[in-house]
Every structure is written in C-alpha cells, then in structure tokens.
Amino acid sequence: MPIFKKYKDYLDRLEDKTDLNMWGFDNNSIYRIFQFEDFNKALDFINHVGKLSEEIDHHPDILLYDYKFVKISFKSHDKNKVTIDDYMSAHLVDKIFDGESL
C-alpha cells in the first residue's frame, strides 16, 4: 500500500471530500477531465502527474484526447474500488493543475 508521508497534511483535509467536487465517479473509480490551451500543456501536465505517481507509488489511468483534454482516473486496482489513496492522489493532481508546487 502506498505511503503518503510527505503529503500527510493533505490527508486531514480529505475528511470532507468537497475539495474534490470537480471529480466524478464511474466504474468504481473517480475521474476528472482537464482542459488545456494546447497539446504541449496537456502533455506537460501528464508528465507532472506521472512523476508524482511514481513518487507516491499510486498510478492513475490517463487518457489524452482531442489534443488538449486529459482524463485522469483513479481506483485501487488491488481492491477494485476507490480508497483513501485515490482521494489523496486526486487531491494532489488538483494541486498540480492549479500550479501549486508539491
């Protein structure tokens, strides 16, 4: 199971999931679609999410389509459902999208 020690302060904020109001729920996963100005910005975002995912050892499904839309989906594959790790990861992805450094 991933350990999010570096991001522990975010866990406390996840008691109230309203921080994730831009995320939907589908097929036992949470997802969000992000829109960018162009392909390069979308790809840069994907690379940032990929780096974070490696760091926390929790990996999303990522879909880039129509050259500027990115769909990020999380579910804990070993449990086949959404867990706190997924909510935590989604919150961190939102921070990346908002331009905050982690």
Region roles according to the model:
Residues M1-L102:
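Charge-rich alpha-helical segments
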